[in-house]
C-alpha cells in the first residue's frame, strides 16, 4: 500500500513540476499565422528557415507554427507563381500575422495539348511535399482522388518529401495522352533522412 501511495505521490509531484515548465515555454514561444485572399496561394507550401513545415491552409490548430523569438525567414512556394520570401520578427508569447500575396510567374511553362501527359498520385501522408524535376509542385492531396497533375510527355523525376519520413523518389516517362499513377506510403525516419528539397532556401 505504501509503495502505491508513493508512486501516486511521485506522479503528482512530477506533473506539478512539469506544468510550470510547459506554461513557461508557451510564454516564450511566439506563433505565426497565415492568411491570403487567394485560394490557390492558401494551398502553397511553406518553408521556415529553410525547412518545409506544410502547406499554408493546414498550419493552424494542432498544426500551428510555434517559433522561438527572433528573426525567421519565411518562404512560400506554389507552381506557376514567383516564390514569396519575407524575414519576420517573432516576439515572445505574441502572435505574428502574415498576409501572403503571390505574383504569377511569367516564365512558367505549361504543357500543350499535343504533348500533355497525366500523373495521378496516391500518397500518404497527404500533406507531403511533391517535387517534379526538383521543382515544388504542391502537396500530395492536390493530386489525389479526382485531381491529376498535367506534365509534358517524357522523362520526369518525382520526389515526395516530408520531415520525419524517408524521401520517396521515382522516375516516370509518360507518353502523350497517357495517365501514370504513383502510389506509395512514406516510411517514417529521422529528420536527417529527409531530402534536401524540403530543406532548401
Predicted regions and their residues:
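Short loop/turn and low-complexity linker motifs enriched in small/turn-promoting residues
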Residues: 21-201
